[in-house]
From Swiss-Prot:
Pathway named in the protein's UniProt entry: Lipid metabolism; fatty acid biosynthesis
Residue span(s) of domain Carrier: 4-79
The species this protein was found in: Roseiflexus sp. (strain RS-1)
Keyword Lipid metabolism among record annotations: yes
Function according to Swiss-Prot or TrEMBL: Carrier of the growing fatty acid chain in fatty acid biosynthesis.
Modification sites for O-(pantetheine 4'-phosphoryl)serine: S39
BP-aspect Gene Ontology terms: lipid A biosynthetic process
One GO MF term: acyl carrier activity
Protein name as catalogued: Acyl carrier protein
HAMAP family: Acyl_carrier (MF_01217)
Length: 82
């Protein structure tokens, strides 16, 4: 399970990248439908997450990250595998 620190850090990044209030960034929030991200927003957000967490997220994996929880789970899995 992702740590509260990881979740908080991810929320800050998503809020900055997508220009949304952190209160709207809940685990089940979908980036495109709920947080109004377009494809460019998603690319920039993924790049920022890669830098912040020191992980590489290949395009084919990035396409599967649809919700905040998906992002948390993916990053946690990558960090544990490192």
């Amino acid at each position: 399970m992702p740590s509260p620190e990881m979740e908080s850090r991810l929320k800050k990044i998503v809020a900055e990248q997508l220009g949304v209030d952190e209160s709207k960034i809940v685990p089940e929030a979908r980036f495109t439908e709920d947080l109004n991200a377009d494809s460019l927003d998603l690319v920039e957000m993924i790049m920022e997450l890669e830098e912040a967490f020191g992980v590489e997220i290949p395009d084919e994996d990035a396409e599967k990250i649809m919700t905040v929880q998906d992002a948390l789970n993916y990053i946690e899995q990558k960090l544990q595998a490192a």
